[in-house]
Amino acid sequence: MKIIIFRVLTFFFVIFSVNVVAKEFTLDFSTAKTYVDSLNVIRSAIGTPLQTISSGGTSLLMIDSGTGDNLFAVDVRGIDPEEGRFNNLRLIVERNNLYVTGFVNRTNNVFYRFADFSHVTFPGTTAVTLSGDSSYTTLQRVAGISRTGMQINRHSLTTSYLDLMSHSGTSLTQSVARAMLRFVTVTAEALRFRQIQRGFRTTLDDLSGRSYVMTAEDVDLTLNWGRLSSVLPDYHGQDSVRVGRISFGSINAILGSVALILNCHHHASRVARMASDEFPSMCPADGRVRGITHNKILWDSSTLGAILMRRTISS
C-alpha cells in the first residue's frame, strides 16, 4: 500500500514540476539571433502550426486552447550582455491571448499587476495592483507618448528596466507606462508579429545605437490581431487576404508579417474585460465569424461589408 501511495505522490509531483517548468520562458536580448530563437521557443510551446499557411519550414501558428494555468512568465535577459546585469525583470503573460498582466521585480518578488488584472496571482510573489489598466489607450495617455513613432533600442530598454526595478507603490507612473509600452512591444507584439520582430531585432546587433521605430502599419497590425486571427485559418490559397487596411498577396506575405494567432473558436480567447475599443486585438465577440471568400480574395466580413456598402451608395 505504501508503495502505491508513493508512486501516486511521485506521479503528481512530476506532473506539477513539468507544469511549473513549462510556464517559465527566457527572452534573451543578447543578440538578434538569441532574441529570435527565444521568441520561437515560446511560440512553439504554446502554438500549433497551420499546415495551410506554411512555407520553407516556417508556419503560422495558432495558440493551443491549453489546459491548466493560463499564465506563463517571461524572464528578460541579455539587455546588458557584456556585463550580464539587469536580469531581474519578469513579465507575467496570459497564455490564451498574450496579454501582459504586469511585471515582477525578482529582487523582492513583488508582482505589479495592472488594474484590469487585479484577480491575477502568480506563485511565489506578493501582488500590488497598479492604479491604471493595461489598455494601450491608458498606457499612451499616462506615458505621454504615442505608439506610432515610438523608438526602442537597447539603451531605451535599459532605461525602462531600471524604471521598473525602482518602482514601488500602486501608482501607474509615466516612467512605468513608457517602460511597459516598450517591453510589451518587443515581447507580446513581437511574439504575434514577425514584422515587429524583424523591425526590432536588427537593433540588437547595431553598435551605432539605431532604434526600431514603430510604424503606423505596425500599430495597425496590433489593433487587428483578433480580426486576422478569425480570418487567416480560412486561407486556402486565395489570391490575397484583406482585413481593414491590411492586405497580404501571398503565403510569404502572411508569414512575413504574422507569426502567432489567437484560437478564436475557443471560448477563452473571446472573453473581454473591457469595451472592445480598449482591447481591439480580441477575437470578434461572435466566435462563429469567419473569413469570406469573394472574387478569389479572403475578406474579413466587416471589411467586405463596408466596401460593398460604399459601392451600393456610389451606384
UniProtKB/Swiss-Prot annotation:
Changing residue 248 to Y: No effect on enzymatic activity; 10-fold decrease in cytotoxicity. Gene3D superfamilies: Ricin (A subunit), domain 1, Ricin (A Subunit), domain 2. Residues 274-315 are annotated as: A2. Changing residue 311 to E: Reduced subunit association and cytotoxicity. The active site is at residue 189. GO terms for molecular function: rRNA N-glycosylase activity; toxin activity. It catalyses: Endohydrolysis of the N-glycosidic bond at one specific adenosine on the 28S rRNA. Residues 1-22 form the signal peptide. Disulfide bonds join 264-283. It is an enzyme of class 3 (hydrolase). InterPro entries: Ribosome-inact_prot_sf, Ribosome_inactivat_prot, Ribosome_inactivat_prot_CS, Ribosome_inactivat_prot_sub1, Ribosome_inactivat_prot_sub2, Shiga-like_toxin_subunit_A. Keywords: Disulfide bond, Hydrolase, Protein synthesis inhibitor, Signal, Toxin, Virulence. It comes from the Bacteria. The record marks 273-274 as: Cleavage. Belongs to the ribosome-inactivating protein family. Shiga toxin contains a single subunit A and five copies of subunit B. The A subunit is responsible for inhibiting protein synthesis through the catalytic inactivation of 60S ribosomal subunits. After endocytosis, the A subunit is cleaved by furin in two fragments, A1 and A2: A1 is the catalytically active fragment, and A2 is essential for holotoxin assembly with the B subunits. This is Shiga toxin subunit A. The lineage of its organism: Bacteria, Pseudomonadati, Pseudomonadota, Gammaproteobacteria, Enterobacterales.
